[in-house]
Amino acid sequence: MSGSHTPACGPFSALTPSIWPQEILAKYTQKEESAEQPEFYYDEFGFRVYKEEGDEPGSSLLANSPLMEDAPQRLRWQAHLEFTHNHDVGDLTWDKIAVSLPRSEKLRSLVLAGIPHGMRPQLWMRLSGALQKKRNSELSYREIVKNSSNDETIAAKQIEKDLLRTMPSNACFASMGSIGVPRLRRVLRALAWLYPEIGYCQGTGMVAACLLLFLEEEDAFWMMSAIIEDLLPASYFSTTLLGVQTDQRVLRHLIVQYLPRLDKLLQEHDIELSLITLHWFLTAFASVVDIKLLLRIWDLFFYEGSRVLFQLTLGMLHLKEEELIQSENSASIFNTLSDIPSQMEDAELLLGVAMRLAGSLTDVAVETQRRKHLAYLIADQGQLLGAGTLTNLSQVVRRRTQRRKSTITALLFGEDDLEALKAKNIKQTELVADLREAILRVARHFQCTDPKNCSVELTPDYSMESHQRDHENYVACSRSHRRRAKALLDFERHDDDELGFRKNDIITIVSQKDEHCWVGELNGLRGWFPAKFVEVLDERSKEYSIAGDDSVTEGVTDLVRGTLCPALKALFEHGLKKPSLLGGACHPWLFIEEAAGREVERDFASVYSRLVLCKTFRLDEDGKVLTPEELLYRAVQSVNVTHDAVHAQMDVKLRSLICVGLNEQVLHLWLEVLCSSLPTVEKWYQPWSFLRSPGWVQIKCELRVLCCFAFSLSQDWELPAKREAQQPLKEGVRDMLVKHHLFSWDVDG
């Protein structure tokens, strides 16, 4: 066929042969034979060009230079593959090369120097892990296409609208009759079917179209699968775009670190960089750089993953940093930033600058920042996340295609994570809603019982700044230096120098010089009273309220132990790994014990942290430094000591610990401590659990509301009452009365 061949560097020559538009090639041949000028010219990638474009002074040098394969570079690649697989030259064929290539510095240097274009389809599949996915999949691409062909969903309709918008200047996708359009439709519909929680995103369309230019349809699909599941974080292409939004925050953090002058400029002009760079990341540069540069970027991207997106973006910004700094106004800066990708013409220069500037950036550093900023982003939005959304934060979930395990297998080895995810994530929104309602009920109780709490703001603060203030507020002790006590019994006033009070009255202590008789004030009167008739209040960081005292207001006990504690327990039980058939107990208390111990041990192991604690955290009554971690550890130990003595159940222990956290106003900080103990959380919880998802930050913000109220809850409220002799109290009072008659009391202290 006359149109079946295209010369090197000629139209469509860089594309996979199966996507060559034969009708256009046939017309080219006819025009050449008749010496007529063709209606349009196309480059080797199928993009429409104008013959005189190369003569224009503003045209791109990169666009006008033909794609030439470097013969020595191809030989180096062949030598590496032969050496790695120990084959003779004549025996080396792609079917004999492993589905994944062993990673090494040599391989990385080859990738960085560029993959020979003719080897890209096979090497991309191996570097990205797509070939492994293709061979291991239980469903073939043909079956996936068949299942998705009749899928008349919203995603399918949107795909149909965007087919001609994706790459209109390319002959393979220019019209509904173009050869690439049916391929793109099948790939996008297959992806939307396989990843129902993602559906369709325009970013996937651009990436898929570029892949289809160089790979066969099935291989392009599995490349997209590798990008979605492995190379990019979860939620990159979801409706919320949480993944790519998070990466924009990570990018701003990296700019502060690597390009401080540019960071200062962006802050001075109040420029939101994500408005420009989000599209770069969403399409992996497919829609913003020249196709020749894109090939070099993707060589590295498929080998090293999403870290490359940050490195190259930093490199681009660095190359234009001086021009940006010299810009006169915000509009000029914004326009310059927007034009940066299209002005990148030297691939070697860009890659060299990017690696010199940010080559030290590691996946661990990127993932650490992602985890933090994703959690803050979710909390900042202040939204109740649905089950599907929360699921997609930790991993991309495929449509279930595996057969269900047998009952015996499930008992011995547990259910599949996906099966458990499907069954349990349905209630996530309900769990958060139940907790929020429990918190509001407690808050309304305080406002109704004690009017001074009416001004407390009950709307959670989801801002990033709120997390920074948490520890500052924890460190700050009570600004009121009053020492107060609560009356345990009625004390009737008989003399002018005595202070009478009723049970549960709050007395301001003036003097504690005597062991038995203290001096205090109540309602403007000052006098002495029996010390054993009162209980000193812990008001280091709060002001006592009868609404939170379970010895005065019984209703608070029902609200806390009967409503709030079960709601919190349900969250801690969500995704808790169940024991095997021969396993032991499974309860959130066991996780809390282990996490508290691990965190406090980590602090003790750090000499530096011990040195700065005195400047960072408040002191307890003994003058000892207590971090939130240490306070949690002590509380757990205290609960164990008192509750084990009466063989209390773990449910009771958990409720008592929550009461201690409310008393100390640190319940939200304790949740942060527990969820930050990653090894322990991963040991006890499934990947889809609430505590392993960034959703815990939202719960922390909800719990923070409770630290605005003063609780005085008994840790041992559910334990059997102890029989205490009343004689010591009477003897103490008798001693006090003797002293009163023998000595003259100075009630002025």
Swiss-Prot record:
Q: Which SUPFAM superfamilies match?
A: RUN domain-like (SSF140741), SH3-domain (SSF50044), Ypt/Rab-GAP domain of gyp1p (SSF47923)
Localization annotation: Cytoplasm
Which tissues is this protein detected in according to the database? Widely expressed.
Q: Which residues form a coiled coil?
A: 415-439
**CDD domains attached to this UniProt entry:** RUN_SGSM3, SH3_SGSM3
> Which cysteines are cross-linked by disulfides?
none
Phosphoserine modification sites are: S406
Q: Return the Pfam families for the record.
A: RabGAP-TBC (PF00566), RUN (PF02759), SH3_1 (PF00018)
**Ranges of residues in domain Rab-GAP TBC:** 114-305
What range(s) does the RUN domain occupy? 555-718
A molecular function annotated in GO for this UniProt entry is: GTPase activator activity
GO BP annotations listed: plasma membrane to endosome transport; positive regulation of GTPase activity; positive regulation of protein catabolic process; Rap protein signal transduction; regulation of cell cycle; regulation of Rab protein signal transduction
UniProt KW keywords = Cell cycle, Coiled coil, Cytoplasm, Growth arrest, Phosphoprotein, SH3 domain
Identify the domain of life: Eukaryota
Chain ranges of the SH3 domain = 480-539
Q: Where does the signal sequence lie?
A: none
- Cellular component per GO? cytosol; gap junction
What quaternary structure, including any partners, is listed in this protein's UniProt entry?
Interacts with GJA1. Interaction with GJA1 induces its degradation. Interacts via its RUN domain with the C-terminal region of NF2. Interacts with RAB3A, RAB4A, RAB5A, RAB8A, RAB11A, RAP1A, RAP1B, RAP2A, RAP2B and PDCD6IP. No interaction with RAB27A.
Tell me what this protein is called: Small G protein signaling modulator 3
Tell me which species this is from: Homo sapiens (Human)
